[in-house]
C-alpha cells in the first residue's frame, strides 16, 4: 500500500472544517492536521492509501462549495512522499491521531 498525502487550501476556517469533515467521511483517510497560513488561508492535510486520498480530496473540494464564502485556493496529492518530509513538514502521524489511523486501516504496521 502506498501512503499518500492530500492537501486542500481554503479561504476561511469554516471552509476548512467542512473540508476536513467531508474528507474523513468520504474515504478511509486520517486527518493529520491543518496549518493556518495567514490572511484567512488554511490548509487541511490527510494521509492514507493513494486512491482513498484522491477520493477524499475530491469530496473535500466538492463540499467546500456548500460553505457561504468558502473557497478552494489550491489542492494537491503527493502519492509517495519522501520520508524526510515527515520530519520537516506537518504531515506526520502524531500520537494524537494514531488512534484514528488504526481505525481507518487496522492492518497498518506502526513505524
UniProtKB/Swiss-Prot annotation:
<dbReference type="GO" id="GO:0015979">
    <property type="term" value="P:photosynthesis"/>
</dbReference>
<keyword id="KW-0602">Photosynthesis</keyword>
<dbReference type="Pfam" id="PF00936">
    <property type="entry name" value="BMC"/>
</dbReference>
<dbReference type="InterPro" id="IPR020808">
    <property type="entry name" value="Bact_microcomp_CS"/>
</dbReference>
<comment type="subunit">
    <text>Homohexamer. Interacts with full-length CcmM. Forms mixed heterohexamers of all possible stoichiometries with CcmK2, which might form dodecamers. Only very weak interactions with CcmK3 and CcmK4 were seen. Interacts with CcmN and CcmO in the carboxysome.</text>
</comment>
<dbReference type="GO" id="GO:0015977">
    <property type="term" value="P:carbon fixation"/>
</dbReference>
<dbReference type="GO" id="GO:0043886">
    <property type="term" value="F:structural constituent of carboxysome shell"/>
</dbReference>
<dbReference type="InterPro" id="IPR044872">
    <property type="entry name" value="CcmK/CsoS1_BMC"/>
</dbReference>
<comment type="similarity">
    <text>Belongs to the bacterial microcompartments protein family. CcmK subfamily.</text>
</comment>
<dbReference type="InterPro" id="IPR000249">
    <property type="entry name" value="BMC_dom"/>
</dbReference>
<keyword id="KW-0120">Carbon dioxide fixation</keyword>
<dbReference type="InterPro" id="IPR037233">
    <property type="entry name" value="CcmK-like_sf"/>
</dbReference>
<feature type="domain" description="BMC">
    <location>
        <begin position="4"/>
        <end position="90"/>
    </location>
</feature>
<keyword id="KW-1283">Bacterial microcompartment</keyword>
<protein>
    <recommendedName>
        <fullName>Carboxysome shell protein CcmK1</fullName>
    </recommendedName>
</protein>
<dbReference type="InterPro" id="IPR050575">
    <property type="entry name" value="BMC_shell"/>
</dbReference>
<dbReference type="InterPro" id="IPR046380">
    <property type="entry name" value="CcmK"/>
</dbReference>
<keyword id="KW-1282">Carboxysome</keyword>
<comment type="function">
    <text>One of the shell proteins of the carboxysome, a polyhedral inclusion where RuBisCO (ribulose bisphosphate carboxylase, rbcL-rbcS) is sequestered. Assembles into hexamers which make sheets that form the facets of the polyhedral carboxysome. The hexamer central pore probably regulates metabolite flux.</text>
</comment>
<comment type="function">
    <text>Probably the major shell protein of the carboxysome, a polyhedral inclusion where RuBisCO (ribulose bisphosphate carboxylase, rbcL-rbcS) is sequestered. The central pore probably regulates metabolite flux. Hexamers make sheets that form the facets of the carboxysome.</text>
</comment>
<dbReference type="GO" id="GO:0031470">
    <property type="term" value="C:carboxysome"/>
</dbReference>
